[in-house]
């Protein structure tokens, strides 16, 4: 029954409205500093990329803001006719052989180019037409010979331009050439790393970082600056109805898109509204992994959570033993990635060894994933312990035995129960405790699986006691709400500091 979910949604709406009303204090001077920091990084990235593009493409002009021209650099080819290109591919029915043949027949290889001054306009890009009487018009016109650039670009046929990647399947075809989305660039970066293509790795890293910095400047720096009210507060809008899994999304700006981890400089601009106040973040430890351990009843996962096994150190050890030295911090990016559908494909051999090891180590999770797939095939839907249902009416089994929508089938139950059920019910519990104790400290945001509290300078110890009380009650709250025996420990870890970024663990 969805009765419990509806009740939780309605109850949470009240507390999200309170979060919006309270607002989150913003240091505008610090925000300007972050803007300058990102802008300087962006300028350097553009310079570095332009220098690298010059080496890869010769004098051929490339606009970094154009996905089409970026694809020229990456794939070293372009469609003969863009008008018919996108209609050539059916990613669901086209075989790999037909795809490769279609690409060969409908693209041309790009070569490095040499720029020579246009003799028609003498490099000015402008010409003056001649009147019938032989005199020149006073007004200039664009030179059509060089398209007003002042240069003619001549192919150097002995040197293919770009990184020379091949787009592997028809799903990589885009309207203007080939895909340059974030996930595709990450995949190609992994391939480049495997093949020792260091220049390609560096180029793709820079392109992805430039895209990220542009997003940070527009979505966060500009977004925060635009939506901060005259009282110096950003009133965080948290929405329950935009995501498939029920987890919260945001608007004006979407704070839920804030990168994970403790290094994102935008977090530094958020401070307490009180002089001497602090910001506390109560973060669930490995929440989605713990939920997956419970839902799958994987004995290894449950044992590791219960005993406090350091999974990140284990990840680092596996990858290092396979020949690629890796720190614990670096390993965090890999530890739970297989849980969300990531594989070793396109990664270094040492990293791929860990992804293979994950499947073997947590065989119970893998078995549960297969059970979910069978449930979706049989009923067209899957369920979570809270009563939420996810419909997959078009799910089928492919000829090779794999199941369509498998990534969503694996991810939705974990993400939904963790972030759409456990986090909200915990937020409500903590918010009620703060109010019941008539405290000025208040919840001002929640991102991913954390709860952010603006702590009054006289209430730090009281807030810590409330977080401790929540930890003691988490399992009881979850079990009582949904009639479960949640046999995996849940833990909120608190950090506190003068702003949202510069926080330290609370002993």
Predicted regions located by residue number:
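Short, contiguous acidic/charged loop-to-helix segments that flank catalytic cores in large enzymes
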Residues: 132-134, 220-229, 261, 270, ...
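Conserved "right-hand" nucleotidyltransferase catalytic core of DNA-directed polymerases
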Residues: 1-261, 274-278, 352-360, 364, ...
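Short hydrophobic beta-strand that contains or immediately precedes a catalytic carboxylate
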Residues: 64, 279-283, 492
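Catalytic palm subdomain of template-directed nucleic-acid polymerases
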Residues: 18-42, 292, 343-347, 451-469
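Flexible loop/turn segments at secondary-structure boundaries
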Residues: 71-72, 245-250, 256-258, 287-290, ...
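Function-dense linear segments that define catalytic or interfacial modules
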Residues: 237-324
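A common structural junction motif
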Residues: 469-481
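Conserved catalytic core of nucleic-acid polymerases
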Residues: 14-21, 122-138, 149, 174, ...
